A protein has these predicted regions:
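Compositionally biased terminal segments of proteins
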Residues: 1-160
């Protein structure tokens, strides 16, 4: 099911999401924007896209970055071919982070639970609520623990 959420992304974020979608890249929205989409709006100074680490997806992500107009001098396909990479484009409050791993959750277990949300007219895949809670709990940062607690209340309300 696609759920609408208008005017959430700035133009850079929307353009990057559109480029990933157009390239056919496998990705999910994670981080603070995913927290907001799942019902707990909060301030964040970047956007986090979790991309599947694989050779095939790496080619698609690089194509998306080229289409987006990202500076590619220090970025290669190999950066997206294995876990534990973070590629940052731009500076806060418009920074885009492309991650190949998130704490506490593996791609293969999260992908079937991703939900597609209509964000600014784009069908954006978002990490599932349960996986987002696990990710936030695993990170160990105080703000992520607060996010997890708020998301758990939202999950309880949905299950009531």
């Amino acid at each position: 099911m696609v759920m609408a959420n208008s005017n959430l992304f700035n133009s850079d974020y929307a353009d990057m999401a559109r480029a990933l979608l157009d390239a056919g890249a496998e990705f999910m929205l994670v981080g603070g924007y995913a927290v907001s989409v799942h019902g707990y709006p909060r301030t964040t100074f970047d956007i986090d896209f979790w991309v599947r680490p694989s050779p095939e997806n790496a080619q698609k992500v690089m194509g998306a970055l080229r289409a987006f107009g990202a500076p590619l001098q220090e970025i290669s396909e190999a950066d997206f071919d294995h876990p534990d990479m973070v590629v940052q484009i731009g500076v806060a409050p418009r920074r885009i982070d492309l991650l190949t791993r998130i704490d506490g959750v593996e791609w293969e277990e999260a992908a079937p639970h991703a939900v597609t949300k209509d964000i600014d007219g784009l069908p954006v895949p978002v990490v599932g609520l349960g996986e987002l809670i696990r990710n936030k709990r695993a990170s160990g940062r105080p703000k992520d623990a607060a996010d997890a607690a708020a998301l758990e209340k939202i999950a309880e309300g949905r299950n009531a």
